[in-house]
A protein has these predicted regions:
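Noncatalytic regulatory segments and standalone regulatory/sensor domains
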Residues: 267-365, 374
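Ser/Thr-rich, Proline-interspersed low-complexity disordered segments
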Residues: 81-155, 344, 474-475
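Active-site-adjacent substructure of cysteine-protease-like catalytic cores
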Residues: 224-275, 425
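Alpha-helical adaptor scaffolds
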Residues: 364-372, 380-434
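Register position in tetratricopeptide repeats
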Residues: 368, 404, 438, 468-472
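Cysteine-nucleophile protease catalytic domains, especially the papain-like/related folds used
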Residues: 148-226, 298-320, 324, 328, ...
Length: 475
């Protein structure tokens, strides 16, 4: 093919180009006439040569069209994002909108998870008491008048923030950079991402990873779950910016995780004031909308503070300062929300997702409490109802619960389904590697741990997994 192309260029294309240069630009209809001017009207090879050039051009165009999806998929997402929508559609291999449902023969072996039984209300029946003897009436003593509880202001906002619009998939580092700017820190999202997210295509940075980064700067950070709207207000009023992890819904298929920085509230408008790395500075989000989207992540939040003020943070958290009590309360809330779903929703693409996300939260809290059998059963419920295909980009409780209960095929099936939607998720590679290692597939486990480290160099869980593989290979 290359030889024919060079021959065509030498013997035909160049003379025609000379003719075009002499006569000026010509149309496609004049091409044949131009060639006949070069070779003469009776040259029998002209038509054959034209057909050859046409065939080569069509072959090259056809090859380019066949390779186009492969070439577009090879583009990093941060560049492909700017392609026209029809070309972006070529990047995505077909996959189900929901994660695979559990194997019912396996799931049925797990005890069903009952709703919590409410405690009965205790009533006391007074028993007859003997008539008391008369006693002298004591003189009244003055008691101190309690000071009135100050009424919270109906509107409050923290200032001194530097807003940053996020780079590709970088809402975690961008939101953290905005939160740190409140304390006068100069770190930008680029600097933070170089530590927390070395792969620019990584989909997720966890609240725990962000808290670790904050601690490395000498500041305080605390991750908690089961938050409430009132607690967010109290923290902000006390001078503590709060990062919340929420769902971001474009439509039923296009949903993903997104961090928002809470910097204030306005009761008259019924909104929180946020710094949003995607949608802009000082953005108002309705209370009910934020709570519904926040709920998808078990209402997790990250409080930023100066270490000298940690006692004030703990005072606001109250009993939730104890992790076990916090998880038990969040678990009870998840149960209650499953038992009484609202008739309408304000933020979800499908209102049925209320119960699906509720069961997922039940599993998340049980998993954190170490009740892996019950957690696996709760995750089974969520999967049967239809769990969004991006859920395990951000939350990994199902992997841990199924692994802890020996359901390695479920771990592998979920990892395969998740990696079909995005190929650079180190957590999915890690858990699939752990499941394969438990099944004795040492080579498969090595490949998975190495891929996890390729996307997140130096990540300690994958390094530990690879060390286990090497230990088994020596036996």
């Amino acid at each position: 093919g290359q030889k024919l192309l060079r021959t065509a260029q030498r013997e035909m294309a160049y003379p025609i180009a000379v003719t075009i240069a002499r006569r000026g630009s010509i149309t496609g209809d004049q091409w044949y006439k131009a060639s006949r001017t070069v070779y003469g009207p009776d040259d029998p090879t002209v038509k054959d040569r034209l057909l050859l050039i046409l065939a080569i051009g069509c072959a090259l165009m056809g090859s380019a069209l066949l390779l186009l999806p492969t070439l577009i998929r090879a583009l990093p997402g941060r560049y492909a994002y700017y392609l026209p929508e029809p070309l972006q559609a070529l990047r995505h291999r077909p996959h189900p909108d929901t994660l695979p449902t559990p194997d019912f023969t396996v799931a049925r072996t797990v005890p069903p998870l009952p709703y919590p039984t409410p405690m009965p209300t205790l009533t006391f029946t007074p028993s007859p008491m003997p008539s008391p003897l008369p006693t002298p009436t004591p003189s009244p003593t003055p008691s101190p008048t309690p000071s009135p509880t100050p009424t919270p202001p109906p509107r409050f906002i923290l200032t001194r923030f530097r807003h940053e619009y996020q780079r590709w998939n970088n809402c975690g580092p961008a939101t953290l950079a905005m939160g740190l700017s409140y304390f006068g820190r100069p770190e930008t999202q680029r600097e933070i991402a170089s530590v927390l997210r070395p792969d620019p295509e990584d989909k997720n940075v966890s609240p725990e990873e962000m808290a670790g980064y904050v601690h490395s700067l000498g500041l305080g950070a605390r991750v908690a779950v089961g938050g409430t709207l009132e607690r967010l207000k109290r923290l902000v009023r006390a001078g503590f910016p709060v990062i919340v992890e929420t769902w971001y819904v474009r439509d039923a298929r296009d949903q993903l995780g997104h961090y928002r920085l809470i910097i204030g509230y306005d009761d008259a408008m019924g909104t929180f004031i946020t710094q949003d790395s995607l949608d802009g500075p000082s953005l108002h989000v309705r209370y009910d909308q934020l709570d519904e989207l926040w709920r998808v992540f078990n209402r997790v939040y990250l409080v930023l503070y100066h270490p000298l003020r940690e006692g004030e943070v703990l005072a606001i958290l109250g009993e939730d300062g104890d992790e076990t009590r916090m998880l038990e309360r969040a678990l009870a809330t998840a149960y209650e929300e499953i038992a009484a779903p609202p008739s309408t929703c304000v933020a979800y693409a499908r209102c049925e997702d209320w119960v699906t996300f509720g069961w997922f939260n039940v599993g998340t809290n049980l998993n954190a409490l170490g009740r892996f059998e019950d957690a696996a059963a709760a995750y089974d419920h969520a999967r049967r109802l239809g769990l969004h295909h991006r859920m395990l980009w951000y939350q990994f409780g199902p992997y841990e619960a199924y692994y802890a209960t020996g359901r390695y095929e479920d771990v592998i099936a979920l990892a395969n389904a998740t990696l079909a939607t995005a190929s650079n998720l180190e957590e999915s590679y890690y858990w699939r590697g752990m499941a394969r290692l438990a099944q004795g597939d040492i080579k498969g486990a090595r490949r998975d741990f190495e891929k996890a480290l390729r996307y997140h160099p130096g990540w300690s869980p994958a390094q530990d997994g690879l060390a286990k593989v090497e230990e088994m290979e020596k036996r």
